[in-house]
């Protein structure tokens, strides 16, 4: 796992087309913005896990 430190307003670049920007920090919450092409799915982990569980149920 790569661990990086960013300040508010700073950006990470993933590949050629994805950027992740730190928008704000309040207490233990960090707001981030993600710019990615439409063909790249971006989900919070808990939403992604729910989607995967639903896909698994449909296969059963």
Swiss-Prot record:
Keywords: Activator, Cytoplasm, Repressor, RNA-binding, Translation regulation. It is found in: Cytoplasm. InterPro entries: CsrA, CsrA_sf. It comes from the Bacteria. SUPFAM superfamilies: CsrA-like (SSF117130). GO terms for biological process: mRNA catabolic process; negative regulation of translational initiation; positive regulation of translational initiation; regulation of carbohydrate metabolic process. GO terms for cellular component: cytosol. GO terms for molecular function: mRNA 5'-UTR binding. It holds the Pfam family CsrA. Homodimer; the beta-strands of each monomer intercalate to form a hydrophobic core, while the alpha-helices form wings that extend away from the core. A key translational regulator that binds mRNA to regulate translation initiation and/or mRNA stability. Mediates global changes in gene expression, shifting from rapid growth to stress survival by linking envelope stress, the stringent response and the catabolite repression systems. Usually binds in the 5'-UTR; binding at or near the Shine-Dalgarno sequence prevents ribosome-binding, repressing translation, binding elsewhere in the 5'-UTR can activate translation and/or stabilize the mRNA. Its function is antagonized by small RNA(s). Belongs to the CsrA/RsmA family. NCBIfam families: csrA (TIGR00202), PRK01712.1 (NF002469). This is Translational regulator CsrA. The lineage of its organism: Bacteria, Pseudomonadati, Pseudomonadota, Gammaproteobacteria, Enterobacterales.
